[in-house]
Regions:
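Amphipathic alpha-helical interaction surfaces in cytosolic regulatory modules
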Residues: 23-99
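Short acidic-hydrophobic, aromatic-tinged amphipathic segments that line or gate anion-handling sites
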Residues: 101-105
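Residues at or immediately preceding the N-termini of alpha-helices
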Residues: 26, 106-107
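A short, charged, amphipathic alpha-helix used as a generic interaction element across diverse proteins
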Residues: 114-115
Length: 115
């Protein structure tokens, strides 16, 4: 799985998978993010950039929920930015739109994490 990790100036770790998050790669995504959680305390927030994704399956959703809990345990913030209407539908159907900080605009997500 191709994933870009970028540490932004504001203490934000941006994690951007370049392919859909499915059973084929959700475990790899989860492991990579868990490894980034071991980084120094200079990181205070995480941004999952899903703008290249068109689809999430149940394994992808499970990974997101697990990582959300892990990030919360560390008293850090998580925002998710996406563009796909299909992904929005998944978040709404699973009611994750009530649990997660979701954005369809990259700048809004960054602003939320920078506050």
């Amino acid at each position: 799985m191709q994933i870009e990790l970028s540490e932004l100036d504001e203490g934000i770790m941006e994690i951007r998978p370049r392919e859909n998050l499915t059973a084929a790669n959700a475990a790899e995504f989860k492991i990579l993010v868990q490894e980034s959680l071991q980084k120094p305390d200079s990181l205070r927030s995480y941004l999952f950039n899903f703008t290249d994704l068109d689809f999430l399956d149940s394994s992808g959703i499970s990974s997101i929920v697990y990582l959300h809990r892990q990030i919360n345990k560390l008293n850090k913030s998580l925002a998710i930015v996406y563009e796909s209407d299909q992904i929005e539908e998944v978040f709404v159907l699973t009611k994750l739109n009530k649990l997660l900080n979701l954005f369809q605009d990259y700048e809004e997500a960054l602003e939320e994490l920078s506050d």
